[in-house]
């Protein structure tokens, strides 16, 4: 139970001491409990920001944050509670996550350090609508904090001479296969179908998976996963009938492999060379376009 030192959310700053979290008193010494005080600032739009100072016991912090969040969200009718802490504070991070807060992002180099350098700060939150506890609540919290990778789905279309379809884009010098970045919660194959429709105006029945490639960090991008799907046979007449998305695609062409080597990045060409050489029932896994 949390004591209500201020009964109105609009009151601004309402200090909440950890000793009011009565269910923890039988697990931790009174001295440990009274050493932690949370400062809680509430905005006029129903958002509370929780902070504390100095190193704290992680188990105590978890319980205090959980109790404070439940009091603010359920007891006082707020809609959002926020916590910020240095990205290097792993113990605090675990406590915040275990208290049901979800990682929303990182504010880069905003915390001034004694040596004159700056550190990143992680932003965590709990909403009144968040499910907390149980399998779903645990998974949702962990999903917010675990690594995520970009997923790219491209399509390999060829003609009877084994020339491949490549696209010249509006945003970079090298060419690429039709396709693009898969949206969140979108299956990779359907992402490829959508991208081809958007870029080329083509409703394509995408076939089997040919290549899965891990791409290392490159030109400011983090690492990513690329999938290449079979797109079937096309002709020059097919290309002439496509409706190119003018903001993304300058041109498309059927090119042989020697020409492709001059248009693609070395990584993309390694991947393409492997894909076109696969047998009818073969699939390849590569790292940086190379078989491990």
Describe the residue ranges of each PLM region.
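Conserved N-terminal beta-strand and adjoining loop/helix that marks the start
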Residues: 31-40, 140-164, 181, 212
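Conserved acetyl-CoA-binding loop-helix of GNAT-fold acetyltransferases
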Residues: 58-74, 94, 98, 188-193
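Conserved catalytic-core motifs of GNAT/GCN5-like acyltransferases
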Residues: 84, 102-117
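Acidic, metal-coordinating catalytic segment for phosphate/diphosphate chemistry
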Residues: 117, 121-154
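Unchanged
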Residues: 135, 182-205, 213-268
């Amino acid at each position: 139970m949390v004591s209500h030192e201020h009964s109105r959310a609009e009151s601004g700053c309402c200090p909440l001491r950890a000793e009011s979290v009565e269910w923890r008193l039988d697990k931790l010494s009174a001295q440990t409990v009274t050493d932690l005080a949370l400062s809680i600032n509430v905005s006029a739009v129903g958002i509370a920001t929780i902070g504390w100072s100095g190193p704290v016991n992680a188990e105590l912090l978890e319980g205090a944050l959980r109790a404070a969040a439940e009091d603010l969200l359920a007891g006082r009718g707020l809609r959002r509670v926020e916590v910020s802490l240095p990205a290097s504070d792993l113990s605090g991070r675990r406590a915040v996550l275990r208290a049901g807060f979800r990682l929303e992002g990182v504010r880069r180099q905003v915390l001034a350090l004694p040596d004159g350098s700056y550190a990143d700060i992680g932003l965590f939150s709990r909403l009144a609508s968040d499910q907390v506890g149980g399998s779903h609540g645990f998974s949702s919290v962990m999903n917010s904090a675990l690594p995520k990778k970009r997923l790219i789905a491209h399509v390999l279309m060829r003609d009877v001479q084994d020339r491949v379809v490549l696209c010249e884009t509006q945003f970079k010098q090298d060419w690429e296969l039709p396709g693009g970045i898969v949206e969140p919660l979108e299956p990779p194959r359907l992402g490829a179908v959508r991208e081809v429709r958007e870029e080329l105006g083509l409703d394509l029945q995408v076939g089997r998976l040919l290549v899965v490639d891990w791409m290392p960090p490159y030109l400011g991008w983090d690492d990513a996963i690329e999938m290449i799907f079979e797109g079937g046979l096309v002709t020059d007449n097919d290309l002439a009938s496509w409706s190119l998305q003018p903001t993304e695609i300058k041109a498309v062409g059927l090119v042989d492999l020697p020409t492709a080597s001059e248009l693609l990045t070395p990584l993309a060409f390694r991947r393409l060379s492997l894909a076109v050489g696969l047998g009818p029932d073969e699939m390849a896994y590569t790292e940086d376009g190379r078989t491990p």
